[in-house]
């Protein structure tokens, strides 16, 4: 048998076309360097007095979740991990460095462990280190300034692109400018979270809350059937390239610990997990054998590695399980079904519910965020908004208050499969029951008839619920219900959900959200084809579809595409109309001048100023 080797994969590190990685520098904390992508535009050609003039167009700044991978100045070596984006952690006296990790992985022989596993940190005894605790003290942390800069992107500088329709925000309080103080207040209130484990220094922080840009999560992870560490690391890089704000490692196969370590050390975005999956592996896949002690040790193991948020299915209570008996599709959450089976086998309350305060103490020591799982979410539109789903939601509201007592940041997971007319009730109930803690939803899928296209059926519901107030959307890929997504599925899912998130930002009236739309629309009207491609969410696909019928370089300057041709292009006709209007207007003024006698100056009638 050959010796295990480090993951080797071909990473997607090329910068986006005609784009430049830039960094916004913090004012309160000069160590803060926020990456943004500047899309350079070509000049507009104008005819003035018979002469052609070039009018420059501003760069368009867009959020950049790709991390150092698209910065050609940074050398990427998976075996060393990413450069630290939060260097201030090393000097934080409230943290203590542990001589060794308290937990050891139980994966057995497998791929080469990460070569340089860092020592872990945790809060010193009596120290309150979470973002929520700092916010309540009135402290603006480096992470808070980081996300404030990231949300604004200095869009006001592109004032000519700033025209925007007013939004309808359904009670959200979105300011004209996101300041560090506004971020602090939202985190203190529990209305926003910044998932940022102290053991994930590679992380570029992001904020999740209804008063901020809608975020997108991409699920990754090995299964017992297929995939490998190499593939999952590449999927992480690929997902963040296309706009995933966070990723979740949902590995259920072998070598869960090693897979997670490689992903964390190379991830520029927050990483979430569902710890019950690894806990189940530790007891041989037998749900009845799970114990609080096994789960607790799994939490600590993953906390020491740097996981930023945990899905914890503490809301699946013994009394709720009979409510699912008449459902069309029963309990579809993996975590929910595992815990339901344990509860019924022992006829005892869910141990995650009974030990919830102890879980809070673990998470607060590392500043890990709760993602309270919806283990009883509907798996078909027939089961939407039923008694089981809302009974669990009520419990999640109760647990949110407990988590906040411990200063632990918390978001709430939501459905699922919900027809469009029932979506708003989900958002309204969640805001009321969970005191406006951020909502994080899987879709929802609005119909069950389209396997292979569920990235579309769910993006419809995702755009709608995000408009109503959902803070983060968990993507769905074309492989949903069919198999483990590959690289192309990840891309399709992320792009579909970036569209949904952006549509919701526009509908809510988020400041600056329309700037990119305005820039692309202007480029389209002026037939600046390369700018149209570069401003698109997926420049490669836009260019490929155009070039499939008009591949010649000359087509990049043509005033038509293959859809309408040169004589039926509505925008070309609009240009002609404008030119005719200008010429006709000048001719009319010339006639008026001649009719007035052709004099440069006319006598002013008496009594006029």
Swiss-Prot record:
- Recorded metabolic or biological pathway in which this protein acts: Cofactor biosynthesis; thiamine diphosphate biosynthesis
Which EC class is the enzyme in? Answer: lyase
Q: Tell me the superkingdom of the source.
A: Bacteria
GO cellular component annotations of the record: cytosol
User: InterPro entries attached here?
Assistant: ThiC, ThiC-associated_dom, ThiC/Bza_core_dom, ThiC/BzaA/B
- Recite the UniProt cofactor note for this protein: Binds 1 [4Fe-4S] cluster per subunit. The cluster is coordinated with 3 cysteines and an exchangeable S-adenosyl-L-methionine.
Pfam families xrefs: ThiC-associated, ThiC_Rad_SAM
Binding positions (substrate): 219, 248, 277, 313, 333-335, 374-377, 413, 440
Keywords tagged on the record: 4Fe-4S, Iron, Iron-sulfur, Lyase, Metal-binding, S-adenosyl-L-methionine, Thiamine biosynthesis, Zinc
GO MF terms here are: 4 iron, 4 sulfur cluster binding; carbon-carbon lyase activity; zinc ion binding
Q: Which Gene3D superfamilies match?
A: 6.10.250.620, Radical SAM ThiC family, central domain (3.20.20.540)
Reactions the enzyme catalyzes: 5-amino-1-(5-phospho-beta-D-ribosyl)imidazole + S-adenosyl-L-methionine = 4-amino-2-methyl-5-(phosphooxymethyl)pyrimidine + CO + 5'-deoxyadenosine + formate + L-methionine + 3 H(+)
Q: Where, by residue number, does [4Fe-4S] cluster bind?
A: 561, 564, 569
EC? 4.1.99.17
Give the protein's cofactors. [4Fe-4S] cluster
Signal peptide residues on this chain, from the entry's feature table: none
The GO biological-process annotations, alphabetized, read as: thiamine biosynthetic process; thiamine diphosphate biosynthetic process
Name the positions where Zn(2+) binds: 417, 481
Give the matching PANTHER family: PHOSPHOMETHYLPYRIMIDINE SYNTHASE, CHLOROPLASTIC (PTHR30557:SF1), THIAMINE BIOSYNTHESIS PROTEIN THIC (PTHR30557)
Q: What is stated as this protein's family in its record?
A: Belongs to the ThiC family.
The UniProt function text for this chain reads: Catalyzes the synthesis of the hydroxymethylpyrimidine phosphate (HMP-P) moiety of thiamine from aminoimidazole ribotide (AIR) in a radical S-adenosyl-L-methionine (SAM)-dependent reaction.
- What is this protein called in UniProt? Phosphomethylpyrimidine synthase
Q: Which organism was this protein described from?
A: Deinococcus geothermalis (strain DSM 11300 / CIP 105573 / AG-3a)
């Amino acid at each position: 048998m050959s010796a295990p080797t480090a993951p080797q994969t071909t990473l997607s590190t090329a910068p986006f076309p005609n784009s430049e990685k830039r960094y916004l520098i913090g004012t309160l904390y000069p160590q803060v360097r926020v990456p943004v992508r500047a899309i350079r535009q070509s000049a507009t050609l104008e005819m003035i007095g018979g002469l052609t003039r070039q009018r420059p167009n501003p760069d368009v700044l867009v959020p950049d979740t790709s991390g150092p991978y698209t910065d050609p100045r940074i050398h990427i070596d998976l075996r060393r991990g990413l450069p630290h984006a939060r260097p201030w952690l090393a000097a934080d006296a409230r943290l203590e460095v542990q001589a060794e990790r308290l937990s050891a992985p139980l994966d057995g022989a497998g791929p080469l462990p990460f070569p340089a596993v860092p020592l872990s940190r945790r809060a010193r005894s009596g120290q309150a280190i979470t973002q929520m605790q700092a916010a309540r003290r009135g402290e603006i942390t480096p992470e808070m300034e980081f996300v404030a800069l990231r949300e604004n992107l200095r869009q006001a500088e592109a004032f000519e692109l700033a025209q925007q329709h007013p939004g309808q925000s359904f009670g959200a309080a979105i300011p004209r400018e996101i300041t560090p103080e506004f971020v602090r207040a939202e985190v203190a209130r529990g209305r926003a979270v910044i998932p940022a484990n102290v053991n994930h220094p590679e992380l570029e922080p992001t904020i999740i809350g209804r008063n901020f840009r809608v975020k997108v999560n991409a699920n990754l992870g090995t299964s017992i059937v297929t995939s490998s560490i190499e593939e999952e690391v590449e999927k992480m890089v690929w997902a963040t390239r296309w706009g995933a704000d966070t990723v979740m490692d949902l590995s259920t196969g072998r070598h869960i610990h090693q897979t997670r370590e490689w992903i964390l050390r190379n991830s520029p975005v927050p990483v979430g997990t569902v710890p019950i999956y690894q806990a189940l592996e530790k007891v041989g896949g037998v749900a009845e054998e799970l114990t609080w002690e096994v789960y607790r040790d799994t939490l600590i193991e993953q906390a020491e590695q740097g996981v930023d948020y945990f899905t914890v299915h503490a809301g699946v209570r013994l009394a709720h399980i009979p409510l699912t008996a008449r459902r069309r599709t029963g309990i579809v959450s993996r975590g929910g079904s595992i815990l339901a089976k344990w509860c019924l086998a022992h006829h005892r309350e869910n141990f995650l519910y009974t030990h919830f305060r102890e879980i809070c103490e673990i998470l607060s020591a590392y500043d890990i965020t709760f993602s309270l799982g919806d283990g009883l979410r509907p798996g078909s539109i027939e089961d939407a908004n039923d008694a089981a789903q809302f009974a669990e939601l009520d419990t999640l509201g109760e647990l949110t208050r407990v988590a906040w007592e411990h200063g632990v940041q918390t978001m709430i997971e939501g459905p699922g499969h919900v027809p469009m007319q029932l979506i708003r009730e989900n958002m309204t109930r969640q805001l009321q029951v969970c005191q406006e803690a951020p909502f994080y939803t899987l879709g929802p899928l609005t119909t069950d008839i389209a396997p292979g296209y569920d990235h579309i059926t769910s993006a419809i519901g995702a755009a709608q619920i995000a408009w109503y107030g959902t803070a983060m959307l968990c993507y769905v890929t074309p492989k949903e219900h069919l198999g483990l997504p590959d690289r192309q599925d990840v891309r399709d899912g992320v792009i579909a959900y970036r569209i949904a998130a952006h549509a919701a930002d526009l509908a809510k009236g988020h400041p600056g959200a329309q700037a990119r739309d305005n820039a692309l629309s202007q480029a389209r009207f002026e037939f600046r084809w390369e700018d149209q491609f570069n401003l698109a969410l997926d420049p490669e696909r836009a260019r490929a579809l155009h070039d499939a019928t008009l591949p010649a370089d000359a087509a990049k300057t043509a005033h038509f595409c293959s859809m309408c041709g040169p004589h039926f292009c509505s925008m070309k006709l609009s240009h002609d109309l404008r030119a005719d209007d200008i010429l006709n207007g000048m001719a009319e003024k010339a006639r008026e001048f001649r009719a007035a006698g052709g004099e440069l100056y006319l006598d002013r009638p008496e009594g006029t100023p």
